[in-house]
Amino acid sequence: MDISDFDFTLPEHLIAQHPPEVRGSSRLLVALSDMPLQDRVFGDLPDYVEAGDVLVFNNTKVMKARLFGQKDSGGRIEALIERVLDNHTALAHIRSSKSPKPGMGLVFEGGIRAVMVGREGELFCLRFEGGQTVYELLEQNGHLPLPPYIERAADADDDSRYQTVYAKYQGAVAAPTAGLHFTEELLRRLKDKGAVTAEVTLHVGAGTFQPVRVDKIEEHKMHSEWFEVPSETVAAVEAAKARGNKAWAVGTTSMRALESAARATGYLKDGQGDTDIFITPGYRFNVVDRLVTNFHLPKSTLLMLVGAFSGMGHIRAVYRHAIEREYRFFSYGDAMVLGRNEGGGL
């Protein structure tokens, strides 16, 4: 398949630069194939969830992963922590006029000292000094890493708004943005209706913003992210399916975790590890029946994923509708509900 199959023109003013004034007040485009497109608000989501359906949320928490400082040699440096390996070691993307060499000392804001001890591909391995853990150092001295299409610095409001209300486990560089729309009150309404909630963890990496640089998407190398699907979630999904109910993925990261856990056998299994699953049109879905997701970038792997799930013809019509009606796009933008189309293709 050619990358041009996943391109579209997006007016720049539709890229949301800030969250909505009130969490949960975003618009919701319901784009199920068995009904006309419906323009709703996100608080209407329970209207489309049946008692007994299971909604699976990604409980990852965004780290304040960006650090600014300088090398011992004096040059300025910026580090974006991609993955914490242990209490004092992390892998990071580095921006600097010259790449640091093994053994070079680095000093970041707050007096944080680190040594570059090696490389893993394009990532630099940093060993942090002192008694605090990497997570503690980041929480006290780091900066929230907003996506590259948000053209402003992070502020205090982002510390809460670029985080889901159910975030638990630090490790993400980017938020699972479909979850940003959910409030405690909406979660209560879903449970009152009889919906079941379950959780997975997938620590979203900076690779989620990585552009596809090849013409043939089959040649694209997908980034890897750590995930976990607990046995309780497997049981909740299996019970819902046995009742004839649907499994909802809240966000593409929840979908990638669930489908990764079922990739080997076709059946959902508990476990943890790294996944580089690349879902494109023609993929056979094993777990997810419904997807809540934001609107994605042109030519992105996430646009390919939703095209695989609902069919690219349907997705093109949905995106045309969204642009005509000026929905807000990307991380702080509006959301949509999609259903699985087994015949999904281009």
Swiss-Prot record:
Task: Provide the primary localization.
Answer: cytoplasm
Pathway listed for it? tRNA modification; tRNA-queuosine biosynthesis
Q: For this chain's UniProt record, which GO biological process terms are given? A: queuosine biosynthetic process; tRNA wobble guanine modification
Listed under catalytic activity are: 7-aminomethyl-7-carbaguanosine(34) in tRNA + S-adenosyl-L-methionine = epoxyqueuosine(34) in tRNA + adenine + L-methionine + 2 H(+)
Q: Which UniProt keywords apply?
A: Cytoplasm, Queuosine biosynthesis, S-adenosyl-L-methionine, Transferase
Recorded hits in InterPro entries, A to Z, give: QueA, QueA_dom1, QueA_dom2, QueA_sf
Name a GO CC annotation attached to this entry: cytoplasm
- Subcellular localization(s) per the UniProt record: Cytoplasm
| Superkingdom of source | Bacteria
> EC no.?
2.4.99.17
Q: Name one GO molecular function term.
A: S-adenosylmethionine:tRNA ribosyltransferase-isomerase activity
In the UniProt record, the signal sequence range is: none
Uppermost EC category: transferase
Keyword flag Transferase? yes
Asked if the keyword Iron belongs to this entry, the reply reads: no
Q: Which PANTHER family match?
A: S-ADENOSYLMETHIONINE:TRNA RIBOSYLTRANSFERASE-ISOMERASE (PTHR30307:SF0)
Q: Which HAMAP family does this entry report, sorted A to Z? A: QueA
What protein family does this chain belong to? Answer: Belongs to the QueA family.
Describe the protein's quaternary organization and the partners it interacts with. Monomer.
Q: What does this protein do?
A: Transfers and isomerizes the ribose moiety from AdoMet to the 7-aminomethyl group of 7-deazaguanine (preQ1-tRNA) to give epoxyqueuosine (oQ-tRNA).
The name on file for this protein is S-adenosylmethionine:tRNA ribosyltransferase-isomerase
